[in-house]
């Protein structure tokens, strides 16, 4: 069975490092301060944070998972309104769990149907991973089109992270490597972390390269400070989290939206039992992605 067939089958049935501990196994602290993972959008946690989440859970750490943005996406609504599935037009490799169920006639505002459905997938994924708490910032995904929009979003994210750092002293904070990920929402989250590190608010910070799965397998670890080799038992759980994004179950508000958003990333993350942890670059440059 090919990895694409495995992903389809699973979907149809399923549902700056600061410190010196990066290269050592995660150990629970005496105070059991939480490890807080930040997912810019619904699906990032399943793609590139899940193995690290499970590593911390296995070490006895409480794990809190934050959804940063609402994930509005008008193009995703348009995809779900097309029939047949646009993923299969000229490319039959993508096993879309919503096959035969397209043409939904959803409004294309990108929010009214998309946000609750994407968030339902996120919550199902979080449940599969067994996180101890889910926190939803409920920020509009709005760092685009101007520098003002971008920095307004950075400030909003920064304020919310700062509040969590105050609420949970001693927590570690895990972000995505936004400077590598070609998406302003991801970059803005990394910028917020960078500013808070410089202010001394965050002292234990790591960055997982979620979009590494776009690269050839041999290049995904390039520049990483640490490569997590995910144990097979944890990888099975990570795959269950991925399947939550390719499940057709309208009664649970699951419409396989994550798979329609990033099918290639999901296929690659499903197949590669590794995650890639980075430190923030010494010459880090804040600001939006230069396209």
Give the ranges of each region predicted by the language model.
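The feature marks non-catalytic terminal segments
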Residues: 120-133, 148-151, 166-167, 199-291
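Acidic beta-strand-to-loop metal/phosphate-binding motif
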Residues: 171-182
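Active-site rim/loop-helix segments in enzyme catalytic domains that contact anionic ligands
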Residues: 29-168, 194-202
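Charged helix-capping and loop-helix junction motifs
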Residues: 188-194
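N-terminal export signals
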Residues: 5-25
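Short, conserved beta-strand edge motifs with alternating hydrophobic and charged residues
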Residues: 137, 174-176, 207-210
């Amino acid at each position: 069975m090919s990895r694409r067939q495995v992903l389809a089958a699973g979907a149809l049935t399923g549902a700056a490092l600061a410190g010196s501990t990066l290269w050592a196994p995660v150990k629970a602290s005496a105070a059991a301060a939480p490890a807080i993972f930040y997912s810019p959008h619904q699906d990032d946690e399943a793609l590139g944070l899940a193995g690290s989440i499970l590593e911390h859970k296995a070490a006895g750490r409480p794990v809190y998972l934050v959804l940063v943005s609402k994930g509005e996406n008008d193009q995703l609504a348009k995809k779900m309104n097309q029939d047949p599935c646009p993923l299969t037009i000229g490319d039959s490799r993508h096993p879309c769990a919503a096959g035969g169920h397209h043409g939904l006639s959803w409004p294309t505002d990108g929010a009214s149907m998309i946000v609750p459905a994407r968030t339902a997938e996120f919550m199902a994924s979080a449940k599969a991973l067994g996180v101890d708490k889910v926190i939803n910032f409920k920020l509009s995904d709005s760092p685009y089109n101007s520098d003002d929009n971008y920095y307004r979003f950075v400030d909003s994210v920064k304020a919310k992270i700062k509040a969590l750092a105050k609420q949970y002293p001693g927590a570690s904070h895990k972000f995505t490597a936004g400077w590598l990920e070609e998406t302003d929402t991801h970059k803005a989250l990394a910028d917020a972390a960078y500013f808070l590190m410089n202010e001394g608010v965050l002292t234990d910070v790591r960055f997982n390269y979620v979009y590494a799965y776009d690269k050839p397998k041999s290049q995904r670890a390039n520049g990483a400070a640490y490569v997590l080799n995910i144990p097979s038992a944890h990888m099975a759980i990570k795959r269950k989290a991925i399947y939550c994004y390719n499940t057709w179950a309208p009664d649970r508000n699951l419409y396989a939206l994550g798979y329609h958003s990033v099918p290639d990333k999901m296929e690659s993350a499903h197949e590669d039992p590794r995650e890639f942890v980075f430190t923030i670059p010494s010459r880090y440059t804040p600001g939006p992605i230069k396209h």
